[in-house]
Amino acid sequence: MLYSRESRTTVLFLALVTSLTVLCHSVDVTTVFTTSTITEITTVTAAPQPQNKAETALNTATNIIQTMQFLFNCAPFKWKGPLKITSCALNFIVLLLTAWGYLLKYLQENKLNSDADMEKMVGLGFGEMVGRIFGKGVGKAFTKMDITQKLVYPFEGSNRQKCLLMTVGENSIVPFHDLSTEICFDQYTLDSLSHHNHGSISILDAGSVSALGFADISSKMPSVSELYTLFGDYTIEVLGGITKLASTLNREDWQGERNGFAVLSRDRPNQTLLSVHMYSSSLL
């Protein structure tokens, strides 16, 4: 775990080196301008539809810096009471869902549609998997989280549901050791969730976002914008579930409970598009 001033310096130095590495090796120098705001609710941000390789690489460098900022916020020496720990939990859940969403997008874009393809990616390990999607520099930062993962199949069928199970190890910089996160979905989940009826994040009501506990976050903030890229018109439901889980992890007895949320289809109320549960590995 990180406690000393030397450790803090190491984290920031690694963020700088990895971001410069991506820029030096990936960016075809063109005129690209971007604005990024790092807030307490830090998340991985990227343009929904990058226009060129330079923009993609620049967004990847931003991902690295913000990922390291996330790690820095979660380190014990940065804790300042329950609010700080809740912020860390919120960041962590958003990050896991973002990584899962981009995994599915990566598989779709590369026409890797079989369960075997997904199992191969998951089998790489969390850090290496993220590195394959975003770049090696980002993957190295994620390796510090010491997360093991596997794909499980709770139900049989032609379009059977799959669950990505991710468990935090003892050496993780994330302070929720032995925490397992179970994200269950089917092959059509991402397309169903990311459908944008109105094509713009502006359709999200800022009041609805604030009512979930994000009083200082508008629908234009990076965390909400990134989630909207993946979850579209279902972003409010997902944010509500994330808030519930973050609150649960802030309690000392979270290890003894299984908590989660489900996103139901609006077109087919009996159909679950996505479910997310978090619990101690001892409950497996």
From Swiss-Prot:
<feature type="glycosylation site" description="N-linked (GlcNAc...) asparagine">
    <location>
        <position position="270"/>
    </location>
</feature>
<keyword id="KW-0325">Glycoprotein</keyword>
<keyword id="KW-1133">Transmembrane helix</keyword>
<keyword id="KW-0732">Signal</keyword>
<keyword id="KW-0472">Membrane</keyword>
<feature type="topological domain" description="Extracellular">
    <location>
        <begin position="105"/>
        <end position="284"/>
    </location>
</feature>
<protein>
    <recommendedName>
        <fullName>Uncharacterized membrane protein YNL019C</fullName>
    </recommendedName>
</protein>
<feature type="transmembrane region" description="Helical">
    <location>
        <begin position="85"/>
        <end position="104"/>
    </location>
</feature>
<feature type="signal peptide">
    <location>
        <begin position="1"/>
        <end position="24"/>
    </location>
</feature>
<comment type="similarity">
    <text>To yeast YNL033w.</text>
</comment>
<dbReference type="GO" id="GO:0000324">
    <property type="term" value="C:fungal-type vacuole"/>
</dbReference>
<keyword id="KW-0812">Transmembrane</keyword>
<feature type="topological domain" description="Cytoplasmic">
    <location>
        <begin position="25"/>
        <end position="84"/>
    </location>
</feature>
<dbReference type="GO" id="GO:0005886">
    <property type="term" value="C:plasma membrane"/>
</dbReference>
<dbReference type="GO" id="GO:0005628">
    <property type="term" value="C:prospore membrane"/>
</dbReference>
<keyword id="KW-1003">Cell membrane</keyword>
